[in-house]
């Protein structure tokens, strides 16, 4: 004790950690509730308006207080994150639920659009980009070139044609104004085609002038002629200027998602080439490049030199990768049913095909269903594109009478026989699964109905013979999966039966579009039951309302709890329905197709992580 007193008397300061130093550093703890109350009082005083008094003299302002240390008796209070967040929330403008959902949709679309451009790898690596479309030798007649813009717009409105793009060529109401060779005009008249349809009125001048194009029109509107005739003219011009040599070509390429559609397009091309050759024009050699056919027969045509190739992605990629054919001179590319081709299933194959192009090309994309997301992605491959739209993308053909029936799953096969009595043959029956196709065909054959079947599990000869006999009216019923739903043109079909409702509404639109073609009226009957999701039924309900069709009671009683929000979002964004798949009954955040693609992408990433083979490559 004496030593400690002596040290204190000598003025020695206490060491750190002693009780005396702890007392000097001590800071009184203020409870959270008290700090919040003090902060609320401070904010109340700060926002309280000053009271005016005519008699009272304003008090002098208090001397400035140092903010570094609080005054004696006061406790330093720091602004908490909760208070800051509350203040920011008060100051932020009020956002409605519809605006919040719209912002979420924009973020999702921006994220989905963040994909590599649909361009050759060589062009991306070298930074090559084209600012102007290619030029062709075709020019419209003088009277069309001098047509006032107001007159052209009035014609488009009368045909319900919507165009988007710069320097859009004027529409042409006659095939004669397009300067097509007389043999082609005779072939058109021989098929009973006297006047162009709305998509042909505007689409043909755009394609003939060399512009990149996205063509959207309902099923059965004549989209095939819009890309076939300009391709024939381009190949004819190339052959006249510089004849093709063995092993060279093609000049033009058409890619289709199915063998049946590719074969049908090839037949249309041959229909126009035959009269041209008879009239003395140079020979134009087309090639059908599809799977299931001996590659040696295809190679014989390639060795002679080929002008036009109609192909499916798989066989085309195979020929290009094996260097059996090249696209060095290809200047014309068409993607038929483009929404399917640039979708997740075929996107990798299409990218590989694009990598084989060596120069600029004219690119045309066509489909009846082209959602906004697909349009935005497809534009990455186009140069100053022109969008020609006849009706809403994904709208049903108004010449089709749509009937929806609630049928229990076990009663569908019996009710199918009753539905076959509605109209005379031919009738097309669609199923989701291959097993159902075989089962229905066998059942109909046992009942004495002449039926044939098509699905992906059958070889090419079986599919070819079945389709040929059905098209020639030798068979009454064709049972098929969705391989027969897109693009196939059988004008005499009067009735389409959906044995089960497809999960994606765009497949439904393509299915029912096999009837009601070329201005004729058709009937589409669809079976629904408890297996369909609410989203699918809402899409179907809105499509029936848009087409002014009768609603069955089960769909009429189906309520959408978010209908008001969807209407508000559609008014603000200008996009009706889902921007991903085109369905009218849901928005993109509830899109089943988008959720399915996310799960597929996640599964791919997981398989890449675990590996596919090799040392410790499989777990």
Curated annotation (Swiss-Prot):
GO terms for cellular component: spliceosomal complex. Keywords: ATP-binding, Helicase, Hydrolase, Metal-binding, Nucleotide-binding, RNA-binding, Zinc, Zinc-finger. It comes from the Eukaryota. Its EC number is 3.6.4.13. It catalyses: ATP + H2O = ADP + phosphate + H(+). SMART domains: DEXDc, HELICc. This is DEAD-box ATP-dependent RNA helicase 35B.
